[in-house]
Amino acid sequence: MVHQIKNTEARILLVYPALLKTAVQAAKEAGFPKDRIFQFSDKPNQSVDGIRDWREMLGSEEEANKYSWPKLSPEEATTTVATINYSSGTTGLPKGVCVSHYNIISNIEQTMVMKYLGQPYTRETAPSERWLGFLPLYHAYGQLWTIMMALKLQVPVYVMTQFVYEDFLKAIQDFKITQLHVAPPILVMLSKRPESTKHDLNSVKGALCGAAPLSKELQADVSTRFKMQINQGWGMTEVTTGAIMVPFAINDDTGSVGQLLPNTECMLIDDDGKEVNVGERGELCIRGPQVCLRYWRNEQATKDTITPDGWLKTGDVALYDEKGFFWIVDRKKASLTHAGMAVC
């Protein structure tokens, strides 16, 4: 956090009250002004050691009515940074991934196509859904689904302040959650922990699993036991969130991470830089409207990862079949995983 505060030259720090102590310490180490830290939550908070509630930043109603939100042109939306998510490797400091407004909108639209393939989406005909938000909101996966996709599709999301497995099961039961967005460790818990059978999870019709490799054996076990369809997807911070996904209309049990999202190109490259054939292994390279702009203030890392013509070298080794389904089979370069979520 210290590195991120310094690296972005942040002007405001919004902190959930339970994390205030950690944030204040990081801000101190980064030389960040304490009066620029605000508590951020649904309910108003009393000042704690001089840290005020975020609502104290807000202007008056009169000032709000006079304010004109800037509108980005299509060109500006393509080049203007909307968010910087940090992606760590095994060595060195985390790298800030610059994602544009265009990247986010594109990835939402691409993902919607895969979700509703074969049953075009309209608000009138879309099935009633309820989601449970427990993925970290600092992670691209949580941002896209818990915030962006939910807003776009007008799906209610019940957001957990922290992940506790029994609370997770109880929330599914109480709120009749219909769709889950998970990483493999959650499916391991569903498969192995005895608490899983003590709650009614029948409302869940399907789950999307990403952020780390999932074995087809675990996928089959959870799918069979809980009568839910589990679809895999592949992505990374540098592609906003996703680039490959099994369409929701397909119940795949092969362990595939799916097919390319619309308007996404792919090459699999061997160690000599040559494109491989169907069924052969190669480094996954992606090009599309969801590929990030650059790494924040890290020109060398950008040059090493994104080619001048827009190809992103992912570091993942994959193969594909004649139908365009992909399997991730190895990692070309070492990666770092935290709490079951791949972060590079």
Task: Report each predicted region and the residues it spans.
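Conserved pre-ATP/AMP-binding loop-to-beta segment of ANL
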Residues: 59-86, 92-93, 119-130
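Adenylate-forming
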Residues: 96, 107-112, 169-171, 187-194, ...
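Conserved AMP-binding/adenylation subdomain of ANL enzymes
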Residues: 105-130, 137-179, 192-193
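ATP-dependent adenylate-forming carboxylate-activation enzymes
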Residues: 1-3, 17-23, 155-175, 184-186, ...
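Conserved ATP-binding/catalytic segment of the ANL
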Residues: 274-279, 283-344
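Structural core segment of the AMP-binding/adenylate-forming
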Residues: 1-60
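A short helix-loop-beta submotif of the ANL/AMP-binding
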Residues: 1-12, 29-30, 129-130, 148-158, ...
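Gly/Ser/Thr-rich phosphate-binding loop
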Residues: 56-59, 152, 177-182, 191-252, ...
